[in-house]
Amino acid sequence: KGNGMSILELNEKNNKPILLVLGGSLGAKQINNLIYQNIEWICQNFTVIHQTGLVNNSNDTEANLVHTYGTSYKPFSFIHQNMQDVLSCADVVLSRAGANSIWETAVLNKPMILIPLCGAGTRGDQVDNALYFESKNCAKVLIGENANSINLKDSLLYMLDDKNRSNMQEQLKLLVGQNMPAKTIAKTIIEGIEG
């Protein structure tokens, strides 16, 4: 946690769970809006590290929120080279459900709230990914109309309980340990080479 805490200029004695909000490099307007709709309650209960995206951010909105909530709200357009350290210090990660990002989060044993891209303009893989993690009790999932401010608050309330987060972490350990993704990838490559 140390490097991430120092990069984010957070006090090691921070007594609130750290919520890392990721919408991708371009951001996710839907996720940003859900955070803004619940911002007062969220900042009372979490320290929020918010990757707003390079496109969907508003410097005025961010400046006002930083002024209002101080160290409880830390916005970034994009977290570049230090993502691993920042992810390591998070207690909960709220993000889309792309395969790479959720498996990286799983390997680091971080409970997740997933808001997958869905609808006609997507392949549907994020919904499948999110539902898989939810079925393994490793994530809370908000899809379509269920991705609203009330359900987000309920999911975050669940994550405030140390026991709930700990149970999810145990399930993540089982999931990552059982699937051994690096071994599976290596086996697939070897099989492809050998024909």
Where are these regions (language model features)?
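Donor-nucleotide binding loops and adjacent catalytic segments primarily
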Residues: M5-V92, V127-N129, L142-N151
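Conserved donor-binding/catalytic loop of nucleotide-activated donor transferases
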Residues: S88-A90, A106-I113
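Acidic donor-binding loop of glycosyltransferase active sites
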Residues: S88-W103
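Short hydrophobic beta-strand element within catalytic cores of glycosyltransferases
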Residues: S95, P111-R123
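Acidic, glycine-centered active-site loop in nucleotide-sugar glycosyltransferases
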Residues: N109, V127-A139
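C-terminal "capping" alpha-helix adjacent to the active site of nucleotide-linked donor transferases
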Residues: K136, K140-I143, A147-N164
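A short, well-ordered alpha-helix in the C-terminal region of glycosyltransferases
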Residues: N164-Q178
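C-terminal alpha-helical cap of glycosyltransferases
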Residues: Q178-G195
